Amino acid sequence: MERKGELPELLCPAGDMNALYAAILGGADAVYVGGRRFGARAFAKNFDIEELTHGLRYCHLHGAKLYVTVNTLLFDKEIEEALEYCRELYKIGVDAVICQDVGLISAIRGALPDFEIHASTQMSVNNTPGADTVHSLGVKRVVLARELKLSDVESVVKNSLAEVEVFLHGALCVCHSGQCLFSSLVGGRRGNRGECAQPCRLPYSEGYQLSLKDLSLAGHIPALIESGVASLKIEGRMKSAAYVYTVTKIYRRLLDERRAATGAERAELAEAFSRGGFTDGYLTGKFNGMTGIRSERDKEASRARAAEFTPGIIKKTVYARAEIALGKPATLTLFSKERSFTAIGAVPEPARSSPLTADAVKERLSKTGATMLSLPKENIELTLEGGLNLSPSEINALRREACAGFESCDREAPEIKMPSCEQIPTRKMTTALFLRPELAVAVGESIAKYFDTVFVPLFDRAALAGKYGVYIPPVVTDGELSSVRQRLAEAKNAGATHALITNISHITLAREAGLVGIGDFRLNVTNKYARREYMRLGVFESICSAELTLPKTRESGGAVTVYGRIPLMLTERCFMRRGVCSGKCPQDFSLTDRRGARFPIIREWGHRNLVLNSAVTFTADKPTEISALAARHFIFSTENEKEAAAVIAAYFEGGGYLPKDFRRIGSRL
């Protein structure tokens, strides 16, 4: 949605109430926070409903909005609880929820049709078809992938129906958002459930190649304004109030003055938090120098700034009109430019001795105490008939009711009924992805015998052989769409019938090409609601998230990845490149962690990389459990011909092959 030249919203983080106060003090237009559940920062302090209510009222009093993250992937039994939680958020007046799970988005839209939804960056939206597909779900705003160049951001803004939000400052993941399984499958802490252990910050055989410097686009403010994005987002719900205030204050100034940061302002940003400097490499497409770690100097600078800072509460100055007249209830109206509220109190009585005085009434009305309001006596317009009495407790009650009503953001919330979602039987199929198509050719006889569909990378020449389905690359930017569309048309004309959909945007691309879409595990289907919604969008069947255990896959339905090295990361940067790209990628490139585990890295289309798991998911020795699955999926990547043949024999012919290092589905079988 184009807004060229309009000043975008400055959206700031808050992990606790002090950080929220700091964001408002710094000049935030909106603040985003997490609740105690269903948020992607499970280890932040976060907010309970009472704190959310207080924070929301504080934001609204100061002309800011409050968004709440409900952006983890959900299991079937959690959808109803999450929907009821969203109803509570709606009731207290939250401006929008930020979501990742397609099943939850569908449930919210059905139960709370006017509740604003923003699509989390975890949905991996990186092009216009993706943004429009998400918009069709009832989502107003899309948070784009952080890895996009400015030209690609501009294209989505210009061509999509959705509002566009981009990240402005803060921590960067080396993996495309929503696509990282490293912490989950290696360490048991699921990033898509808010538990990321940040293995990317650890050293590997190539050094700290997974640890990126923090993002800072302070040098690109004029271009970002001109791009027409609706919102610029600062990361940092795990950061201190001092960090939030400093970063918000500087970007507020830069936006208002429509200029890039000075050297002094960059230095101040670095003092707030830095990993050896900042990077703008994704926006500019210049990846050199993107990695960095926290030095002792960085840590000391942040500690010193945090120790000096106390946010404090800014009280909202309001005005009042009060009327106390014989025979009528006393009234008090509080008002500002943005809102007003009238409270009705007790009926005054004729005074027996000392009647009310204007000064005494104003004195009591101005005592706003622990509220968020300030009401100076000079801001009170009082109409007072003489000879009347209203007790101090009655005046205080009138003031309390007026303050509470003025602060309140509550709205009527409908009683919600959980949308019915009958379990859809899993469609029977056995599929395989060969990331090295020459391996598919080598074991061709077995493929024809045991697999319904075999997928090969779209841009490999095997994709035009006519007998394979095509694996659409997980990242396709607007600048790459024409190449992908052309290649899909060529594959279709050559005889391809199916496409492996690894991103929500591919639903449109596959439909345009006339191909049957199979949803890859990267669509992050973890519940039957999401699976049903993808079917409604045109996906024939989905492969469950690789994070689901076998019992969880029975709840959601869908295909299960029973074999293969699961891709843990999809990176925009190429680890194999040394200087100018020769186009000849090494066949045996990997990273090794401190325990000696080796993670193979293979080339993805567009000079991107896939980091594969060190351990192979293997289940052939559990034939009873596996044979009960209606749909199974295999991934072949680093195997040689002999290994691939042995794997196929183990699953389909009773062979005794057992890999050296293997793991089970999800976290256990």
Please place each PLM-identified region on the residue numbering.
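Surface-exposed amphipathic alpha-helical tracts and adjacent flexible/coil segments at the periphery
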Residues: 1-26, 30-42, 53-56, 62-90, ...
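Glycine-rich, highly charged phosphate/nucleotide-binding loops
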Residues: 47-52
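A cross-family signal for key residues in well-ordered alpha-helices
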Residues: 106
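Residues at the C-termini of beta-strands that transition into short coil/loop
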Residues: 121
